[in-house]
Amino acid sequence: MAGARGYHTYRGRTPKGKIALAVVLVLIILASAVFIFIQQFVVYDASGTPHLQLPGSQTQQEEPEPDETEDVELTIDTPALTGVKLHALAQAPLTAADAQAALTAGGDGVVVTLKDSEGYVYYDSAMPQASASIQTQADTAAALSTLTGSEDCYTVARISCLLDPRAARADVEGMGLKNTGGYIFYDGNNLNWLDPSKSGTQEYLGGLVKECASMGFDEILLTDVSFPTEGKLNKIAYPGAGMQESIRAFLMAMDTALAAYPDVKLSVELPESVITLGQDETAGLVLSEIAPLVDRIYTETTEGSIPALEAAVEAVGEDTVLIPELTAIPAESDQPYLLTEPS
């Protein structure tokens, strides 16, 4: 049916307020889009203040890298050896009273004999070669722990090496220094020695060195490292490798024994004449071959001889230190020394 003539559907008029509202909404949407877009160009400085940085306007500043603290190498030094008194305890099994006396006697350290030139061992060694030669007191182990456990006391274990009548006679084939007849050699004092070239000698003494290091001693001082110099020396059956090479190989074996204890120093005691003359052919000692193998060289001397001895050692062992053994405190006592008698 057709609509009424002259009439159409009335839709009303569009108010101007609605148009304005639509425009505002469009502007808000555009503003939001622009805000979101430029967010990617907002940067913040070190203080947290925002800045607008458009593409191509300037090179983006690199963030400052945090300061890196320079690596510092920490070195822990053991107490300096500036005066060590040898007490009577050094030639006998250590007791608790001896240890306490040593700690209060002054100086910075103590030298304790753990094996003497008669072959006696003054601690409970696990080495089977020492089993018949051990001499201790009930409190020796505790006394040794007292010394090595003191942070203010530099401890040196003194070991007599090749002059050892007990071990030499107990195992002539494995360790003893023989005469040309195949029997144990007796020197001018009717004493017996170990052969430094024999593996049994190196194993035994190397084991003692390792045990002393494991007990906490800061340094191992080897004494009586030489061939005999008294008696019928022409009757000695010297090692085929030669005397000097045998001594050198022995010291290298002792150094190897300390491989697990890199902070423990290895030292040797030499006669003053070996340092001043450079060698002793009779004893098989050559300073230039010995000095590079040890950290310190001890020698009995007087204060006036120290400068010349230091120069001689330094000339053949750049890092080797001379430790003079004195009977009185020197006038210049800022250098290391060993006091062998109470002043």
Predicted feature descriptions by range:
Residues 21-37:
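Hydrophobic membrane-insertion alpha-helices, especially the h-region
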Residues 39-46, 294-343:
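Substrate-binding cleft of secreted/luminal carbohydrate-active enzymes
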Residues 76-89, 162-210:
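Active-site-adjacent "subsite" loops/lids of carbohydrate-active enzymes
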Residues 87, 154-163, 221-222, 243-284, ...:
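Aromatic-lined carbohydrate-recognition surfaces of secreted/lumenal glycan-active proteins
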Residues 95-121, 211-221, 290-298:
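Catalytic domains of carbohydrate-active enzymes, especially glycoside hydrolases
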Residues 100, 116-160, 208, 230-266:
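Aromatic-lined substrate-binding rim segments of carbohydrate-active enzymes
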